[in-house]
Amino acid sequence: MFEIIKKSIEWGGRTLSLETGKIARQADGSVVVNYGDTSILVTVVRKKKEEIVDFLPLNVQFIAKSYAMGRIPGGFFKREGKPSDRETLISRVIDRSIRPLFLEGFHDEISIVCNLLTYDTVNPPEVPALIGAVAALAISGVPFHFIIAGVLVGCDGNNNYILNPSVQEMKVSSLDLFLSGDERSILMVESEAKELPEENILNAIKFGHEHLQPVIKLIKEFADTIGNKFDSFAPIDISDIMQDLEKHSKDFEEAYSQTVKQERAQTLETIRNNILNPLKEAGKDEKLITQAVKNFERSLLRKIIREKGTRIDGRKYDEIRQIEVEVDILSRTHGSALFTRGSTQALVVTALGTTQDEQIVDDIEGDRREHFMLHYNFPSFAVGDASAIRAPGRREIGHGKLAWKAIHPVLPDKSEFPYTIRVVSEIMESDGSSSMATVCGTSLALMDTGVPIKSPVAGIAMGLIKDKNDYVILSDILGDEDYLGDMDFKVAGTSEGITALQMDMKISGISFEIVEKSLEQAKAGRLHILEKMNSVISEHSDDVKGHAPRMVSFYIDKDKISAAIGAKGKNIRSVCERSNAKIEIGDDGKVSVFAMSSAEAEIAKNMMIDSITELEQGAIVDVKVVKIDKSIVELELFNGRKGKMHISEVANQHIESIESILKQGDTFKALVIDFEKGGCPKLSRRRVDQETGDFFEGELYNEEKKDSSNDRDYYNSPFNRKSGHRKRPVHSRSSFSNRNNRPKFGNDDSSSSFY
């Protein structure tokens, strides 16, 4: 029934296999990829389009359902919903790797679905997903003539490169680099690095490319065994339209010489309309005209840049646009920055929170918590578009993650800065490289906030104009240069090295020479941008902003953690409610208190210490009247504990009723004279001077008081004998008193823990 074809190799110490003929046989191409115990089903379906479109309708979806990890989805709904960020990012990696390889003019609808069947939590799925997508395309009949592969590269503590590192190895790796390429060139790179120099990054790319070759050979052998032939494809001939456009060359040259984006865009729109209308009247298809105009502009612009040595806005190849930097522009936020580079502008705002504000991520490796979040927003008005603002799409998620990777390596450890950090980048204007403007703005905003980042970070986007063996590398590309060029190579880092990298191609790959020169030119541009940023702010503020929450931390004994939390969280909840603060207690006994002011944080700290302090006989405490019975007053102590006081301990003279002296809600100072069997303290008001808070050492019992048989046990305390009171040291335990002399709890580092 099944005609199964399977090929496999040993790669990176694990078995990589490709199999087809058993599952999803109605798809044009279907491949099951196994790498270790990670298994992915990749399907390719092609739908021929009669309608002419000026883009490639390629849709790539990576789907990771929880059954692949042996789990049931959490939450109320037990069915997967919208794609996670991880699924979106893997889908983008595959899309960006294969999109440039489709033949120009091919516009059939292509759907690629990568279904994660099993995941061993060791081998990340990005690599087998891309390999499976290429293998499925190779056997689908789609005119896709390039065979590529993907690889992960890590770097250990001895600067040794690791091929396809495991999830555990990636946690300690100084490099997380994914690249795709063919036998001769590099197609796509994405990485996060811990300030690695350009040479290390280039060597990692060479290492990865070398280890791609066995996989490329495997895919070719797999496709040859099946023997599927590619469908013939011939693009529609638009040479006659292209020839007709030659007479508009001068108009386009003048338009592209305008340095202001809005003026340039308006002029180009006018020229295009002047071209479109007559050709439509002549019977030409509008979409073919649009495609021809795009090709003509691309060819003309590339010629201008190569021959004249200047760019659209008059800059040299390696020249950076004018940069303006401002910080602290929003008064009530925790930190803000406005970064403007030419006509690209990012308003970046930070907000600080507690551990309770961390993002819980349901990842394929299991639930994890993120204490640093970076959200990138690209509203339509940033490019003068009138369309409605919608939820973030793949592009916004991808750009935000790239900026996150650029900043993440320089963030302080959570033990050093325990706040949860959220950064939001609002793109106000865009003319290319808005993601790198986000990187620069985020670095500035974090320093303005007071986050102790290790070094400032800047980012730059590089472009490429390539004609056969001749090429020109452009620094800080405009939107038009990105649209009409061959490469978008984003590089972010500090003065010491690279923290993030992303390279996308519009051609079928570039050489190591171009990669190396791009990195060198990007470094010069990055250092120039850092110089501009450092002239405004080069170090983080000494303290967080006035509107940011204050934090104080201290340690308690581990055996007191349960008491600090209380039954079902009662104690910690009570302290939070009474102090208007947030309190977090770690397994190591570290208590972190967050409040809107230092004074509130200190009050909450003292309340927490009081709540776990054991009372002693002779202690003087603040109390509050909760309930009054005939002869007993129920009291609440500073730490929320309950206490009792007999009518005979209210005053030093005979009273007919407690209400004649006290009423509910009254507060006063009381002496702890004894404890009931259950631990409830017995208290006395009459033995304490309410003005000074001192203990009446020598006061005698008023003879007018009469003992009763019911009260005899209550007075059977050494403090209640009529012969006088035993002298003993007395400790004041007031939640409002000076605590400088009170005993320390563990290692109290509160003075050094304020931010």
From Swiss-Prot:
Keywords (A to Z) from UniProt: Cytoplasm, Magnesium, Metal-binding, Nucleotidyltransferase, RNA-binding, Transferase
Provide the residue positions that the database annotates as binding Mg(2+). 482, 488
Q: Which cysteines are joined by disulfide bonds?
A: none
Report biased composition (Basic and acidic residues) as residue ranges: 702-714
Q: Where is the composition biased (Basic residues)?
A: 722-731
The family database entries (PROSITE patterns) matched by this protein are listed as:
KH_TYPE_1 (PS50084), S1 (PS50126)
Q: Which Pfam families match?
A: KH_1 (PF00013), PNPase (PF03726), RNase_PH (PF01138), RNase_PH_C (PF03725), S1 (PF00575)
Tell me, what is an example of a GO biological process annotation in this record?
A: mRNA catabolic process
Q: Which residues form the S1 motif domain?
A: 618-686
Please provide, in alphabetical order, the Gene Ontology terms of the cellular component aspect for this entry: cytosol
Its family?
Answer: Belongs to the polyribonucleotide nucleotidyltransferase family.
Q: Per its UniProt record, what PANTHER family does this chain match?
A: POLYRIBONUCLEOTIDE NUCLEOTIDYLTRANSFERASE, POLYRIBONUCLEOTIDE NUCLEOTIDYLTRANSFERASE 1, MITOCHONDRIAL
What is this protein identified as? Polyribonucleotide nucleotidyltransferase
Species whose genome carries this gene: Wolbachia sp. subsp. Brugia malayi (strain TRS)
Q: What is the lineage of its organism?
A: Bacteria, Pseudomonadati, Pseudomonadota, Alphaproteobacteria, Rickettsiales
